[in-house]
Amino acid sequence: MVIIMDEKAKLMRCIIERILDEYNKGKTLDKKRIEQIKAECLRIHRIGIGHPSNSEILQYATEEEKKILIPILRKKPVRTISGVAVVAVMTSPEKCPHGKCIFCPGGVGSVFGDVPQSYTGREPATMRGLMFNFDPYLQTKARIEQLEKVGHPTNKIELIIMGGTFPARDIEYQDWFIKRCLDAMNGVDASSLEEAQKINETAEHRCVALCIETRPDYCGEKEINQMLKLGATRVELGVQTIYNEILEFCKRGHTVEDTIKATQLLKDSGLKVSYHLMPGMPGSDMEMDKKMFKEIFENPDFKPDMVKIYPCLVIEGTELYEMWKRGEYKPYREEEAIEIISYAKSIMPKWVRTSRIQRDIPATVIVDGVKKSNLGELVYKYMEKHGIKCKCIRCREVGHVMYKKGIMPDIEHIKLCREEYEASGGTEIFLSYEDVKNDILIAFLRLREPYKPFRKEIDDNTMLVRQLHVCGQEKPLTKDLKEITWQHKGYGRKLLEEAERIAKEEFGKKKILVTSGIGVREYYRKLGYERVGAYMGKYLE
């Protein structure tokens, strides 16, 4: 039987064969060269269409060809370069429990319509939420399909719940929302949240991390118990600043003391803590903001594991917008924001990760303030120009260093490193495997001796593993794709063994508990761990 290809198929096959030919010859296939190949094939096959997208090209490739093509054509490798595929899902609009901050643009009945609190409806995740009427199942399913179309592995998913103070919602809504996200990953409608979690432990798309956003005053024992029940591994706190007078003026509805207490409770429950920080709030200035960052990284009451930094912006429909119109407030200029954030980066400890710089708000809705969405890139350029180095996790992760700088780790110089510090009344030990010659981070583990835990699983004989992460491009759980990856090479197991040794020999503990993502529980079972309440645990003999 003779198969006759249409003209579009001929074009796609031409592009695929050219790429594979150059790949086999060892030629460089960057984004520019791929576009050149598309143009060359379009000149041969004149069919009146523009440059085909990479996802279109992949549809015409065989399964064997895809193994080579996907790593080459993958758009935005940074989406999975830290080791997981991020899926952000937006909750439905709901009024904030405390009222409205003076800089908050969104919410029910805002100038942007009914959108989630603190969003404008123009952010990618919010638009996806609106498109699917904030249905968690449809949002999750669509995002996974979107990531797969552009070549990202989606075996390991970090699920981020956005849209406001999730713990303030009804318990029934919270349980239903997470269950439906898991149903979308599992491809099966479970009868309960617990069943959905159990299925996900061995599903094709596993939830290896679950992040929930909340406020410091909605992060007490009750809220933490619920978040752990849902399967949370990280909590993002809307801290904004550590000055009470500014928090009060901006109508935040919480205090610095709330932040300190929430931070301690979260760490003593084995959860990772991320701070959202907003330099340039009304009443602050550059000197105060620099002091804030120094205090946050040095004062044991704070010391978060991660930070998101976004300068205060003026957006229509806010109380801050009216102040700005009256000349009572002026946000940071671009160069001021760059200087402040560069300073923050310069003093970050090696155990902190910068997860985001700048909100995902389009410039078209920003009335005044930093409008550039690539503020992070501008910060890095400024730092490079002024010889400023950052030691944070993101800047040293193997995936980012290889992708951004083209530097491969030297295996001979990969060593086990240890940094110990006091935080929130307890002792933190940051263990890592690093290329000490090139300052590249391969894998790390956060071990904690708790201060005042309230969970019944955690007693005086317990140490907590709050995070275990191997950096680098996500490696599928199947072993099909032959890519350069640092996952599945035993670094995680070695770090866990060292954590067990430290807990037993140095601290005299008899038990170790790991805050495991739902989809990572099987990994820990293979290492001798079993379910202990919300955790995976092991008794140290």
Swiss-Prot record:
Function noted in UniProt: tRNA uridine(34) acetyltransferase, which mediates formation of carboxymethyluridine in the wobble base at position 34 in tRNAs. The proposed mechanism is the following: (i) recruits S-adenosyl-L-methionine and cleaves it to generate a 5'-deoxyadenosine radical (5'-dA) in the radical S-adenosyl-L-methionine (rSAM) region, (ii) hydrolyzes acetyl-CoA in the N-acetyltransferase domain and (iii) an acetyl radical is formed by the products of the two domains and (iv) is transferred onto the C5 position of uridine(34) in the bound tRNA molecule.
EC number: 2.3.1.311
Span of domain N-acetyltransferase: 401-541
Entry similarity comment: Belongs to the ELP3 family.
Cofactor (UniProt): [4Fe-4S] cluster
Protein name: tRNA uridine(34) acetyltransferase
Gene3D superfamilies reported for this sequence: 3.40.630.30, Aldolase class I
Binding site for [4Fe-4S] cluster: C96, C101, C104
Transmembrane parts of this sequence: none
Annotated Gene Ontology cellular component terms: cytoplasm
Pathway where it operates: tRNA modification
Residues that, per the record, bind acetyl-CoA: K156, Q467, L468, H469, V470, Y491, G492, R493, Y524
InterPro entries with a match to the protein in the record: Acyl_CoA_acyltransferase, Aldolase_TIM, ELP3, ELP3-like, ELP3-like_N, Elp3/MiaA/NifB-like_rSAM, GNAT_dom, Radical_SAM_C
Region called Radical S-adenosyl-L-methionine (rSAM), residue ranges: 76-336
Cofactor note: Binds 1 [4Fe-4S] cluster. The cluster is coordinated with 3 cysteines and an exchangeable S-adenosyl-L-methionine.
Reactions that this protein is recorded to catalyse: uridine(34) in tRNA + acetyl-CoA + S-adenosyl-L-methionine + H2O = 5-(carboxymethyl)uridine(34) in tRNA + 5'-deoxyadenosine + L-methionine + CoA + 2 H(+)
Organism: Methanocaldococcus jannaschii (strain ATCC 43067 / DSM 2661 / JAL-1 / JCM 10045 / NBRC 100440) (Methanococcus jannaschii)
GO MF term list: 4 iron, 4 sulfur cluster binding; metal ion binding; tRNA binding; tRNA uridine(34) acetyltransferase activity
GO BP term (any one): tRNA wobble base 5-methoxycarbonylmethyl-2-thiouridinylation
Lineage: Archaea, Methanobacteriati, Methanobacteriota, Methanomada group, Methanococci
UniProt entry keywords in alphabetical sequence: 4Fe-4S, Acyltransferase, Iron, Iron-sulfur, Metal-binding, RNA-binding, S-adenosyl-L-methionine, Transferase, tRNA processing, tRNA-binding
NCBIfam families: ELP3
PROSITE patterns (alphabetical): GNAT, RADICAL_SAM
Domain Radical SAM core positions: 79-350
